[in-house]
């Protein structure tokens, strides 16, 4: 069986890869060694990666809601992680 190409993989499956790429871009930009043009290109790519990550998280949340109550996914409460503010 052939592997899915990255372009055909679901956003949820690509989340880890997109997040890692985004983190690498941020590190490159924080060094300050990129030219203005390279910085703009990196920023544009970063925005695209951010959107992919956001879409993957939204799809994952929807899947969790559907699994929690398939009859009424809209009635489920949004997940609020516990605060670590001590």
UniProtKB/Swiss-Prot annotation:
The family classification in the record reads: Belongs to the XseB family.
Organism name? Stenotrophomonas maltophilia (strain K279a)
**Main localization of the protein?**
cytoplasm
What the protein does comes down to:
Bidirectionally degrades single-stranded DNA into large acid-insoluble oligonucleotides, which are then degraded further into small acid-soluble oligonucleotides.
Name the UniProt key words of this record, in alphabetical order. Answer: Cytoplasm, Exonuclease, Hydrolase, Nuclease
Question: GO CC annotation: what is one?
Answer: exodeoxyribonuclease VII complex
GO BP, one annotated term = DNA catabolic process
GO terms for MF: exodeoxyribonuclease VII activity
Q: Where in the cell is it found?
A: Cytoplasm
Q: Know the name of this protein?
A: Exodeoxyribonuclease 7 small subunit
Q: Does the keyword Mitochondrion apply?
A: no
This protein's assembly is summarised as: Heterooligomer composed of large and small subunits.
Annotated Pfam families: Exonuc_VII_S
Q: Which HAMAP family match?
A: Exonuc_7_S
Q: What is its EC number?
A: 3.1.11.6
**Catalytic activity as recorded in UniProt:** Exonucleolytic cleavage in either 5'- to 3'- or 3'- to 5'-direction to yield nucleoside 5'-phosphates
| EC class | hydrolase
**Positions of the UniProt region annotated as Disordered:** 67-86
Q: Which InterPro entries match?
A: Exonuc_VII_S, Exonuc_VII_ssu_sf
Q: Does the keyword Metal-binding apply?
A: no
